[in-house]
Amino acid sequence: MQAIILCGGLGTRLKSIIKDIPKPMAPINDKPFLEFIFEYLKKQGIKEVILAVSYKYEVIKEYFKDEFLGIKIKYSIEKEPLGTGGAIKETLKFVKNEAYVLNGDTFFDIDLSKLKLNESKICLALKQMNDFDRYGTVNVDEQDLVISFEEKVFKKQGLINGGIYLLTKDIFNDFALQEKFSFEEFLQENYKKLKARACIFDDYFIDIGVPEDYYHFLINN
């Protein structure tokens, strides 16, 4: 199975910490955050990774080259940032049938094999959260089909999009899309057509997009 990692983020909120490098290369003691994702994917049995890169991608390529930890690497290079949707769409030319998609700035320690498509074009990994206002929430029915998305408001309890997906190569085929678009917005607008389903996890999750969580991951690794 192949995995796509989205590495094009500018890391605006981490600028004071990581200076002038791509966000997934944020240093965690003696190695970049992205290396933790590679270690995780190796344990999950992934043999090939496609890195969707843009800003200062040379820094990533210099470190990981064309193979890392026995995982083959291909690079999908965006001359201009295409948004998460545009980046995924561009990488799908490297995908055979289906692929996992992960954010390069989040770590979600789930068992990837539990994500199942069945008749759907996409399966989302959702994280059970308590007392939060930083994320929007996702609602599912008893068949694990996505039935709605909610905006960011304080929630005592809810399910958030954990930033890992299993999707088909042809997920975008029936849609007229701009070159640059947000995958999250695409999902919110089209989850019914995609028959989007979800799998709920309670495993360790962290998003290093803000300094507080970056330092938390740094201290614990």
From Swiss-Prot:
Keywords: Capsule biogenesis/degradation, Carbohydrate metabolism, GTP-binding, Nucleotide-binding, Nucleotidyltransferase, Transferase
Catalytic activity: D-glycero-alpha-D-manno-heptose 1-phosphate + GTP + H(+) = GDP-D-glycero-alpha-D-manno-heptose + diphosphate
Name of the coding gene: hddC
Family: Belongs to the D-alpha-D-heptose-1-P guanylyltransferase family.
Function of the protein: Catalyzes the GDP transfer from GTP to D-glycero-alpha-D-manno-heptose 1-phosphate, yielding GDP-D-alpha-D-heptose. Is able to use ATP, CTP or UTP as substrate in the presence of pyrophosphatase, but at a significantly slower rate. Can also form GDP-alpha-D-mannose from alpha-D-mannose 1-phosphate and GTP.
EC number from the UniProt entry: 2.7.7.71
Record's keyword annotation contains Nucleotide-binding: yes
InterPro entries named in the record: Mannose-1P_guanyltransferase, NTP_transferase_dom, Nucleotide-diphossugar_trans
UniProt entry tagged with the keyword Nucleotide-binding: yes
Species, as recorded: Campylobacter jejuni subsp. jejuni serotype O:2 (strain ATCC 700819 / NCTC 11168)
Pathway where this protein functions: Nucleotide-sugar biosynthesis; GDP-D-glycero-alpha-D-manno-heptose biosynthesis; GDP-D-glycero-alpha-D-manno-heptose from D-glycero-alpha-D-manno-heptose 7-phosphate: step 3/3; Capsule biogenesis; capsule polysaccharide biosynthesis
Molecular function, one GO term: guanylyltransferase activity
GO biological process, one term: nucleotide-sugar biosynthetic process
Applied uses, from the record: This enzyme is used in a preparative method to synthesize ample amount of GDP-D-glycero-alpha-D-manno-heptose to be used in elucidating biosynthetic pathways of various heptose components present in capsular polysaccharide (CPS) of C.jejuni.
The protein, known as: D-glycero-alpha-D-manno-heptose 1-phosphate guanylyltransferase
